[in-house]
């Protein structure tokens, strides 16, 4: 992220990345911090209060504009609610906590942007859905994308970005390492050179 950049933090959570991006983008840049969970958004708002170039976007991103059920099942496993453990409960599974959020299409929410330089996406397994829906923005702006992905959706994410002309890498002690099939770290995608 460079001064003047426009960025989207999808799954902003408490704002760790959003604050850093805000500082790097500077007053000429902006960061849209997407966080659908109201109690987490309160903390996010406090954490971003000195970031004049940050805007909190109170939605879950997806393929439709509608109310959705989100859930958090971390208390059952760990004894406390993990703030980064919320997921779209489109399968109706039982969870320790459920709440309603508003889903919006990212391609519509951010469709009028004049530029998009960086996207961070960490949304508990919903990354494939959201990145496919935001494909028009990825094709138009070709932003660098940092994506947390693991398990079953990782090959789908890699295939999507490869098809779009991106190359993937991971970080190892501050150095970029080309993406391999056995890599499990978060992926940075940049347009291939």
Predicted feature locations:
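Phosphate/nucleotide-binding beta-alpha loop and adjacent structural elements of enzyme active sites
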Residues: 1-193
């Amino acid at each position: 992220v460079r001064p003047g950049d426009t960025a989207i933090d999808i799954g902003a959570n408490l704002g760790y990345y959003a604050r850093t991006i805000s500082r790097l983008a500077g007053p000429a840049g902006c960061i849209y911090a997407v966080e659908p969970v109201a109690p987490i958004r309160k903390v996010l708002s406090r954490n971003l209060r000195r970031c004049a170039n940050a805007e909190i976007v109170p939605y879950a991103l997806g393929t439709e504009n509608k109310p959705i059920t989100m859930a958090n099942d971390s208390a059952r496993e760990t004894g406390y609610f993990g703030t980064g453990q919320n997921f779209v409960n489109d399968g109706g599974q039982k969870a320790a906590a459920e709440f309603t959020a508003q889903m919006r299409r990212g391609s519509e929410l951010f469709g009028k942007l004049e530029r998009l330089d960086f996207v961070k996406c960490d949304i508990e397994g919903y990354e494939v859905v959201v990145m496919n829906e935001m494909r028009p923005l990825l094709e138009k702006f070709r932003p660098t994308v940092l994506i947390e992905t693991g398990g079953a959706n990782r090959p789908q994410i890699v295939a999507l970005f490869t098809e779009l002309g991106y190359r993937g890498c991971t970080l190892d002690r501050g150095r970029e390492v080309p993406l391999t099939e056995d890599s499990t770290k978060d992926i940075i995608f940049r347009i291939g050179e």
